[in-house]
């Protein structure tokens, strides 16, 4: 389990095909210094298992399913990633409960910089929209954030994904993406988050990993079972 408090920004230094997946080498001196074979490290919100390490790097395997679901599948050598080691028992829970199991991805639709902070608007897949609430918690690229705004429950048009649908203009908005249509949410980033995570360099059109609150996912599942007709397919 993780808490969504990023410990350092790492860099992917090698990608090797391993079966139908990848083996990544990540340079992250703080995490690698005491990395143990078999332990879990979150890489931009994706829980990976350490299979080897040096003083400054660690290796981890990524299965095809993860590459298909997470934004990590588009990573290249040189990609910067958020790093967090698993939370030890008894540690302070500084963010919220993050499992490292990515639910899907969103696209940065808008960046609104302030004097010392920035607001990001991110698209939200339709199936995740009911799980994201104003003032609730969400993990974006492994970073625990508080949702500062959400789209209406019934958006006007469009889908929750805005891939490749426009170009970045000076306003920091994805041109032609129809930010008024489709599901989205906003997060406000304080200076510490901008400096300590990769979110500070995100631009319009970037794809990010999303993990919704585990409590919301459990409630949704329980309600689905309760609503299912007795003896029906579940």
Where are the model-predicted features located?
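Conserved loop->alpha-helix
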Residues: 1-155, 161, 173, 179-234
């Amino acid at each position: 389990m993780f808490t969504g408090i990023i410990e350092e920004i790492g860099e992917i230094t090698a990608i090797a095909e391993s079966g139908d997946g990848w083996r990544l080498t990540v340079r992250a001196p703080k995490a690698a210094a005491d990395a143990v074979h078999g332990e879990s490290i979150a890489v931009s919100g994706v829980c990976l298992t350490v299979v080897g390490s040096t003083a400054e790097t660690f290796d981890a395997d990524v299965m095809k399913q993860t590459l298909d679901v997470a934004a990590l599948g588009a990573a290249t050598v040189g990609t910067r990633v958020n790093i967090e080691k698993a939370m030890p028992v008894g540690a302070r829970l500084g963010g919220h409960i993050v499992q490292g199991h990515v639910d899907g991805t969103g696209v940065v639709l808008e960046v609104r910089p302030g004097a010392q902070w920035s607001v990001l608007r991110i698209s939200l897949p339709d199936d995740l929209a009911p799980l994201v609430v104003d003032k609730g918690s969400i993990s974006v690229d492994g970073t625990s954030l508080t949702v500062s705004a959400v789209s209406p429950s019934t958006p006007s048009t469009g889908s929750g994904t805005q891939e490749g649908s426009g170009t970045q203009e000076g306003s920091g908005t994805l041109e032609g993406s129809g930010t008024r249509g489709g599901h989205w949410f906003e997060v406000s980033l304080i200076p510490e988050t901008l400096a300590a995570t990769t979110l500070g360099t995100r631009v319009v059109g970037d794809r990010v990993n999303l993990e919704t609150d585990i409590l919301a996912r459990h409630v949704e599942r329980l309600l689905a079972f309760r609503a299912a007709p007795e003896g029906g397919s579940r």
